[in-house]
Amino acid sequence: MDDDSLDELVARSPGPDGHPQVGPADPAGDFEESSVGSSGDSGDDSDSEHGDGTDGEDEGASEEEDLEDRSGSEDSEDDGETLLEVAGTQGKLEAAGSFNSDDDAESCPICLNAFRDQAVGTPENCAHYFCLDCIVEWSKNANSCPVDRTLFKCICIRAQFGGKILRKIPVENTKASEEEEDPTFCEVCGRSDREDRLLLCDGCDAGYHMECLDPPLQEVPVDEWFCPECAAPGVVLAADAGPVSEEEVSLLLADVVPTTSRLRPRAGRTRAIARTRQSERVRATVNRNRISTARRVQHTPGRLGSSLLDEAIEAVATGLSTAVYQRPLTPRTPARRKRKTRRRKKVPGRKKTPSGPSAKSKSSATRSKKRQHRVKKRRGKKVKSEATTRSRIARTLGLRRPVHSSCIPSVLKPVEPSLGLLRADIGAASLSLFGDPYELDPFDSSEELSANPLSPLSAKRRALSRSALQSHQPVARPVSVGLSRRRLPAAVPEPDLEEEPVPDLLGSILSGQSLLMLGSSDVIIHRDGSLSAKRAAPVSFQRNSGSLSRGEEGFKGCLQPRALPSGSPAQGPSGNRPQSTGLSCQGRSRTPARTAGAPVRLDLPAAPGAVQARNLSNGSVPGFRQSHSPWFNGTNKHTLPLASAASKISSRDSKPPCRSVVPGPPLKPAPRRTDISELPRIPKIRRDDGGGRRDAAPAHGQSIEIPSACISRLTGREGTGQPGRGTRAESEASSRVPREPGVHTGSSRPPAPSSHGSLAPLGPSRGKGVGSTFESFRINIPGNMAHSSQLSSPGFCNTFRPVDDKEQRKENPSPLFSIKKTKQLRSEVYDPSDPTGSDSSAPGSSPERSGPGLLPSEITRTISINSPKAQTVQAVRCVTSYTVESIFGTEPEPPLGPSSAMSKLRGAVAAEGASDTEREEPTESQGLAARLRRPSPPEPWDEEDGASCSTFFGSEERTVTCVTVVEPEAPPSPDVLQAATHRVVELRPPSRSRSTSSSRSRKKAKRKRVSREHGRTRSGTRSESRDRSSRSASPSVGEERPRRQRSKAKSRRSSSDRSSSRERAKRKKAKDKSREHRRGPWGHSRRTSRSRSGSPGSSSYEHYESRKKKKRRSASRPRGRECSPTSSLERLCRHKHQRERSHERPDRKESVAWPRDRRKRRSRSPSSEHRAREHRRPRSREKWPQTRSHSPERKGAVREASPAPLAQGEPGREDLPTRLPALGEAHVSPEVATADKAPLQAPPVLEVAAECEPDDLDLDYGDSVEAGHVFDDFSSDAVFIQLDDMSSPPSPESTDSSPERDFPLKPALPPASLAVAAIQREVSLMHDEDPSQPPPLPEGTQEPHLLRPDAAEKAEAPSSPDVAPAGKEDSPSASGRVQEAARPEEVVSQTPLLRSRALVKRVTWNLQESESSAPAEDRAPRAPLHRPQKPREGAWDMEDVAPTGVRQVFSELPFPSHVLPEPGFPDTDPSQVYSPGLPPAPAQPSSIPPCALVSQPTVQFILQGSLPLVGCGAAQTLAPVPAALTPASEPASQATAASNSEEKTPAPRLAAEKTKKEEYMKKLHMQERAVEEVKLAIKPFYQKREVTKEEYKDILRKAVQKICHSKSGEINPVKVANLVKAYVDKYRHMRRHKKPEAGEEPPTQGAEG
């Protein structure tokens, strides 16, 4: 209101407010105006603070507007000053009565009026009293106590001070419009947010954020505070002279007044709360409201007076009125009249507005000012609301408005998050050694001096602005019910409020503890061992709200955490806990941030087990860190956060220790485990993905892994809930194999990804959806472990979370983990040297990866996901191998309920038999996990996620072998398959060469894997299950039982895992399988596996490749080479199995696919064998539902793998016959066949996929780094290929590529052979069958396919990219969705596909450098660069716009799942497969579905009813290898386009090609835009030298890729900026921790970008 109005109000208001105040009010107004004019903030700010809200209200209610305006609502300064003066006058008048009593009486810290008869409000979490209207007004903009900043959600209303609580009203979280109207901008950072910490200079009213000051203030000063300029000695505002004099007079009078309060200048002058923009606004609003109310009260009939209080309380409670006493209904009429009259006045006044400033006559000036203010406010609103390019650029560059006298824009000081700031953000009181800062008043001397009340005129006058002076005086006194209506009690300065003790010495100690317990991503560990909050979360802040602070710290980025921490520290943890009730874990309080994040996720997963696991993970300090990262993920993706957070928390808290502790489905024990591995992980900030949860789950079987507690994180086998941590630890210790069992625990699984920063989140996010896997994978890049991890996790969580949440997650955490694993597989697919390729263990591809992915030098871990769900069904064992760089500290393990499964897996690592048994045990112990993982679609992804998380955290590379045992409980529960996924993570030194050390690690890992795979291969049924499991980590739950059934095979594999020779053999097999996998959708995965397996050791990998080529049929021999004797045995055993399967398969047309299946089974026995068996034999039929149909099923499997691989697993098995026939019948319409099965599981899968999709999208940027990583992984297969070449160590890459290059040799095979080989490969990929397995030779075509294994491997690389493109475009989520939509079985097949994609992604990264020559080529065609670009978009839009190939597949082929999984492979027609000119096939990845469906059907039919697509994809892959190599160098999109054109020879292909081209152009445009946005966002960091040129390029590439592959398909500058910032943080972190592979990985992503 205008000063005049205010004066009028005052005049009309009760005597105390009388005219005497008008005079001062006017000067105050004038001064305020001048002040405002000069400061541009003071007047406006005050007005905005107090008046803005009222203005909004007034304008909303015009009548009230006038009244309130008059009462000083217009200008907070004017109003505040006037009111303050009035209050002062009142004080003088009432000095004798009011003030004397007031001195001793408690007074409201906000309005400084003594509590008399007004209603009182107290925040629920502290004992500070405020006038009800004051606290209500305050809560509109900040829900923290004005005194101690404690967060509160409810206000307790009391009739009087000390009275009993009448009622509680929830805080209105609606930010007052005041903020928008006339914001005060910080003079340093130029931002107007955080108003409760935006200090207003008492001299010039300029705003400064506490954290922007130098040095930053830890506490909001209660006394006067002067900005640096005003604090300068001798600085006196010219404007202050006049106005201040009047104020000073009133102040002096007030001080002289013979009242205790007045005699105590401090009491009268000292503010009870700091003067911030928030406090000023609230005071102004309250003052305005009270004056208007008082005015109205005058006209209120006496009889109504008594009801005034009640009405006020009621009004406040109902939110009808801003102020308790503001609008009694009766007095409204008079007010309206007056308002109307005044309005008329205002109108002219407004017209005068322009002259108002010049004319300073009291009334006119005041009116003018106020009107002007309104204008200003409106301007402010407009300015604030509109975000122009210039403003955005200026903000990015750190430019802000020029200083008053300057025309050159000043450069803003970037807001450096500080503990104080973080604490403030969460409402935590600032730390003070002396206790309550306000009680002891330990403020800076500068503040004290400026506010020195002893020299009222000198000190005050020198810098106090009118509003500042007023802030020391009470505002208009609230109308008290007891007071006469005509009398407004004079405002009485209130003595310092007794404040709740804030953190004291003990508090600071606790804060330090909180810091120790923060998620690794939240804390920066310095070389000297000291810790500092990375997120600038003040120690006290963190300590204040253990979970809360972490959540906050962890951040705003982590919305969920934030929501959780919204309460006080206690509230944060408890709030979090409630969310993750199932996860209740001591670690929670310790790891609040993560806890907060986790709870949200936990909420999503209805499975308490999973929640518990997560919670447990949270418990440990390292877990805390990890949880933080997951939090980040959570932040990135709220949908994902619940499950993901839970997982992450679990991972964080229950890292490997958690796993150890939890030997069975119970996830809670896992957290205990976390402690052991947490210590080592803490430094690895990237580890806060949610490994805790996984750890919790694996706890039962994790104990075996405990020896590798340190390695837990590296191993990434922490627990199902704590993949990230486990991964790290594992990467540190080669004996991580035991950890696999830990991973085994279903609940823990989701968090597993959180183990390494990114990877850990990957696990949880994987649980969410396929898309997350890559994100996590990306984030796992060595750079910013913590940050990436956090970001990554969300992406995964979101991506898979929806799936998991909807189906599996709610049922049990296992599903999440399963999904994670799938993601992980994808990530790790081609990342032999790129730890980020943790995704390698895609659901279908996982087993295969196991062989190739494991690096001898890497620590081997076995992750088993137990899902008691389908234990009755034949067990399918899936062994997935993939190499993960140490970027991610942990490799998530399937979070299936039974930790025992995990520990068994670990045991299996120690001993084959043990491993097998354990894997089986997990099935039983996974009762909970299975339940959690019930939604079959998510489970495969869980496993993949786990794999993803398995990546090592730092520079070390780790090979993760995923052994998934899928046991269909019974045909009745086709949707949920119990899958036990055992992951063997091999850690290898940063040197990525697959040579000796790598080879050893890989050998060891391979041995483990081999033993696992042997086990898988041993049991036919188990093998099928395995195939399926391997294909889809998610099916791990369902596979749990199959694993048991495959116990022998598993033990074999486990033994292999544990024994280097076996592991080597397994690796070789895995490699072969990988190749075959890569041929098919699973081939993609396989490729990664191989690349992982081989990548780690150059020699190993090369051997592997040659073996793959040579021994695609005899996987055992290549593996033997790599694995040494055991490898040979393993391979031979697998060979036998494969042959058996082959024989069995011949029973079905799928004979051709058998070899691949078997082979895959060897490396990823579960997935490959599973699929193959499902296709090939009755048993395979039984498990077929579990496994993916070759083509449709495979796509479905991939999809399902992501959404409901397990679910599909069972149904798939039962539906297998149908599916095969359907696919065979309608190869062109595999979708139809898939759709048929989709009804069974499609809903869950789709649900999951859908959820994943949104989450991934959400993750896009905010979670952007995480999600972005995932998306990059998912989206840019071709890009990834390039990245692989660039980022992966050349030697490893070359080695990895070697097999891929060998793949081109494959084309030598007869065209039919090639086609069959490709198909087989795909089939094996889809069916978890190792294309390279010799047994698949049964059919003539299959034999060529087997020969093709090398080609398959090569194709696998392309296939992987293809799958990845699908994965990227479809990603786990999109693909899952599409396939899920297609059909449950399709989903099942999608699991492998997704995995394959994951593998592809991994493979691409791993092979990037070497692949550029050949493997890259293959991959490029498989996953055209354009696809990588579009993948994200496509992945998320896959259903409606699958990657070109996928789309084509969908449009041409009804089996989107298959198409997606094998975009690259399906691309080639049987004829194309035959023709060496298959290169077009790579381009066809997008269109491969159509091609595969159209021409491949023949081959597919030959191979397997469902395998067709897979086979086709494989065939394509085979031929495309050369093309792929070419595309590797050229944009994948181009390669894909070219390849597609060629591959689109069939009409469907042509259509696909068109679609692909369109998609490519669309992606290209999007990429261009993304590049521009990313450059804009990263420029400031680059200019500030925060990132090096290389990092700049890497981040650009990665961010662009992520953005291009976001589900939303839009480029949100804000999200881009967040994504870039996350990347920058990650790289910073990587530099800090000297992550050797950070450089490599970023390039990988960069290539994608």
Curated annotation (Swiss-Prot):
GO biological process: protein ubiquitination
Coiled-coil ranges from the UniProt annotation: 1549-1579
Alphabetically ordered keywords of this record: Coiled coil, Metal-binding, Phosphoprotein, Zinc, Zinc-finger
PROSITE patterns tied to this protein: ZF_PHD_1 (PS01359), ZF_PHD_2 (PS50016), ZF_RING_1 (PS00518), ZF_RING_2 (PS50089)
Zinc fingers typed RING-type, residue spans: 108-149
Positions of post-translational Phosphoserine modification: 5, 445, 455, 814, 845-846, 864, 867, 915, 936, 973, 991, 1124, 1128, 1202, 1229, 1359-1360, 1371
Phosphothreonine: residues carrying this PTM: 330, 917, 1404
Highest taxon, organism lineage: Eukaryota
Keyword Glycoprotein listed: no
SMART domains documented for this protein: PHD, RING
A Pfam family annotated for this UniProt entry: PHD
Biased composition (Low complexity): 354-366, 988-999, 1091-1101, 1284-1297
Sequence segments annotated as region (Disordered): 1-79, 324-398, 534-600, 644-871, 888-1240, 1281-1395, 1407-1439, 1455-1486, 1526-1556, 1630-1649
Compositional bias per record (Basic and acidic residues), positions renumbered to this chain: 685-697, 727-742, 802-812, 1012-1030, 1054-1063, 1141-1151, 1181-1198, 1345-1356, 1541-1556
Keyword Lipid metabolism among UniProt keywords: no
Oligomer status and interactors: Interacts with POLR2A (via the C-terminal domain).
Descriptive protein name: PHD and RING finger domain-containing protein 1
Organism of origin: Homo sapiens
